[in-house]
Curated annotation (Swiss-Prot):
<dbReference type="InterPro" id="IPR023404">
    <property type="entry name" value="rSAM_horseshoe"/>
</dbReference>
<feature type="binding site">
    <location>
        <position position="223"/>
    </location>
    <ligand>
        <name>S-adenosyl-L-methionine 2</name>
    </ligand>
</feature>
<feature type="binding site">
    <location>
        <position position="257"/>
    </location>
    <ligand>
        <name>S-adenosyl-L-methionine 2</name>
    </ligand>
</feature>
<keyword id="KW-0949">S-adenosyl-L-methionine</keyword>
<keyword id="KW-0408">Iron</keyword>
<feature type="binding site">
    <location>
        <begin position="127"/>
        <end position="128"/>
    </location>
    <ligand>
        <name>S-adenosyl-L-methionine 2</name>
    </ligand>
</feature>
<feature type="binding site">
    <location>
        <position position="79"/>
    </location>
    <ligand>
        <name>[4Fe-4S] cluster</name>
    </ligand>
</feature>
<feature type="binding site">
    <location>
        <position position="343"/>
    </location>
    <ligand>
        <name>S-adenosyl-L-methionine 1</name>
    </ligand>
</feature>
<protein>
    <recommendedName>
        <fullName>Oxygen-independent coproporphyrinogen III oxidase</fullName>
        <ecNumber>1.3.98.3</ecNumber>
    </recommendedName>
</protein>
<dbReference type="GO" id="GO:0006779">
    <property type="term" value="P:porphyrin-containing compound biosynthetic process"/>
</dbReference>
<dbReference type="GO" id="GO:0006782">
    <property type="term" value="P:protoporphyrinogen IX biosynthetic process"/>
</dbReference>
<dbReference type="InterPro" id="IPR007197">
    <property type="entry name" value="rSAM"/>
</dbReference>
<comment type="subunit">
    <text>Monomer.</text>
</comment>
<dbReference type="GO" id="GO:0046872">
    <property type="term" value="F:metal ion binding"/>
</dbReference>
<comment type="pathway">
    <text>Porphyrin-containing compound metabolism; protoporphyrin-IX biosynthesis; protoporphyrinogen-IX from coproporphyrinogen-III (AdoMet route): step 1/1.</text>
</comment>
<feature type="domain" description="Radical SAM core">
    <location>
        <begin position="60"/>
        <end position="294"/>
    </location>
</feature>
<comment type="function">
    <text>Involved in the heme biosynthesis. Catalyzes the anaerobic oxidative decarboxylation of propionate groups of rings A and B of coproporphyrinogen III to yield the vinyl groups in protoporphyrinogen IX.</text>
</comment>
Length: 494
């Protein structure tokens, strides 16, 4: 029987040693595959028929449960590293208007989906969702309950800025039905915090974590970033010491993507203070070693969880999936996106809302869904999304089962990809057999690179002349190397 999931808790010492040797040669820029096709492949333009068709198909699938993402874009202060869609303001009057328009959007969406569809997973992201005052948070939650049925047994999470909440606000979140919280930390080192314009003492974060534990939240997650200015392996190790003292249920340790040509706030970061590639690699490897030694399960890419956390259990049982929030246990449901720039994944279509308040408000003032762009998935997209998801989440692709579901001959349909995989196999990233493809412990550390092999859009890019100055990632097609040309928003694989 083909295994349904990865069973090893983390890459072993040999894999980490090989990773150090290989990373510099195989590194490059690539997608994170929170969707396929990736968001940069969406078609610009408000094709409302695409969204209407998606909602109609979702309505026909009732009473299947939904996932819901709600975007609150406001922040009081700018963090220089941030690449999120955000609005920096101290005018809390702006959020009151935004809440009213969220209600309008919910009404339009719910009217097409059918009344009070059940929501098993919801997530408030930003920006800073806790920018909203208590009254506004109650109002948004009341609107959600008016138009949807938020299942009490579901997973309902919110991103928190520990600098903006106290015990009373945490108690309010629990009262409103949130059972998971995600806290932005990035790094506890004072010099790093100064360089990224985010001063957040450890004691401030500990108070919020303690409140979450006291109030009975099901899960507490912390977000860290490595590759920030002034970081070293030793300094980041001290941050890990402090994080381990808090013992979060989940940890995300993201690689900082320095893209000042895309994200203007990053232009305030001193590039000379960024850790060199070798030091950044040391930070990552030492972090994986330390967290593994402390009992955390390496979920994949940048996610870690305690063994009894839902993510770790889902991985062991082969139920792990990915969506726009990363690894998830509920990614198989249609996801509705609400608020500016929010992305929905509904009935084989991706839809993204307008990115500015003016466009968002303007559409809703005319009684229209605030769609900005999207794409309808082809049969090939569905097939490749399943392959990429299996490799990134479970580490195993069951070829006979895939062939049966999609009516294909894998070896014929993916001959160029298999040739590329042979090259990655020679580097120890994958093991290929007639009935399966298995990602090795080393390959788990570079799983984005493995997934890129099956990205048809990257192959089409590679077939066109590379843009001037673009850095390409080589892959072997059995004859001449394929050059995967990175796009502007892609971050480094390592």
């Amino acid at each position: 029987m083909i295994p349904s999931a990865i069973t090893s808790p983390a890459p072993d010492r040999r894999a980490l040693s090989d990773f150090r040797a290989l990373a510099g040669r195989i590194d490059g820029n690539g997608p994170r595959y929170t969707s396929y096709p990736t968001a940069d492949r969406f078609h610009n333009g408000p094709d409302l028929s695409l969204y209407h068709d998606a909602l109609a198909a979702c309505r026909a699938d009732a009473p299947a449960p939904l996932s819901l993402y709600l975007h609150i874009p406001f922040c009081e202060n700018i963090c220089y590293y941030c690449g999120c869609n955000k609005i920096i303001t101290r005018d809390h009057g702006r959020s009151a208007r935004y809440v009213n328009y969220l209600g309008r959007e919910m009404a339009l969406v719910a009217d097409r989906l059918g009344p009070r569809r059940q929501v098993l997973q919801s997530h408030w992201g930003g920006g800073t969702p806790t920018f909203l005052d208590p009254g506004e948070m109650r109002r948004v939650m009341a609107l959600l309950h008016e138009h949807f049925e938020l299942a009490a047994e579901g997973e309902h999470s919110i991103e928190i800025d520990p600098r903006r909440v106290d015990h009373a606000r945490m108690a309010l979140l629990a009262e409103l039905g949130f059972n998971r919280v995600s806290l932005g930390v990035q790094d506890f080192d004072p010099e790093v915090q100064q360089a990224i314009h985010r001063i957040q003492p450890f004691e401030e974060t500990r108070a919020v974590v303690d409140a979450a534990r006291t109030l009975g939240f099901r899960s507490v997650s912390l977000d860290l970033i490595y590759g920030l200015p002034h970081q070293t392996a030793a300094r980041f190790g001290r941050t890990i010491d402090q994080v381990l003292a808090l013992r979060p249920d989940r940890l995300s340790v993201y690689s900082y993507a320095h893209l000042p040509h895309v994200f203007k706030p990053q232009r305030r970061i001193d590039e000379n203070a960024l850790p060199p590639a070798g030091e950044k690699l040391d930070i990552l490897v030492s972090t994986i070693e330390r967290l593994s030694a402390e009992g955390y399960v390496y979920i994949g890419m940048d996610h870690f969880a305690l063994p009894d956390d839902d993510l770790a259990v889902a991985q062991r049982e082969g139920r792990l999936q990915r969506n726009f929030q990363g690894y998830s246990t509920h990614a198989g449901y249609d996801q509705v996106g609400l608020g500016i720039s929010a992305i929905g994944a509904i009935a084989g279509r991706y839809v993204q809302n307008a990115r500015t308040l003016d466009e968002y408000y303007g559409a809703l003032d005319h009684g229209r869904l605030p769609l900005a762009r999207g794409v309808a998935m082809s049969a090939d997209d569905h097939l490749r999304r399943e392959i990429i998801g299996a490799l990134m989440c479970n580490g195993v692709l069951d070829i006979p089962a895939l062939e049966a579901r999609h009516g294909i001959r894998f070896g014929t349909a993916f001959a160029p990809e298999l040739a590329d995989l042979a090259a990655l196999g020679a580097d120890g990233l994958v093991q290929c057999a007639p009935d399966r493809i298995t990602v090795t412990p080393l390959g788990r550390l570079l799983v984005r690179r493995v997934a890129m092999v099956f990205d048809r859009y990257l192959r089409e890019d590679a077939a066109r002349p590379a843009s001037t100055g673009a850095q390409a990632v080589a892959a072997n097609d059995g004859a001449q190397p394929v050059r995967f040309v990175p796009r502007a928003r892609y971050s480094r694989v390592v």
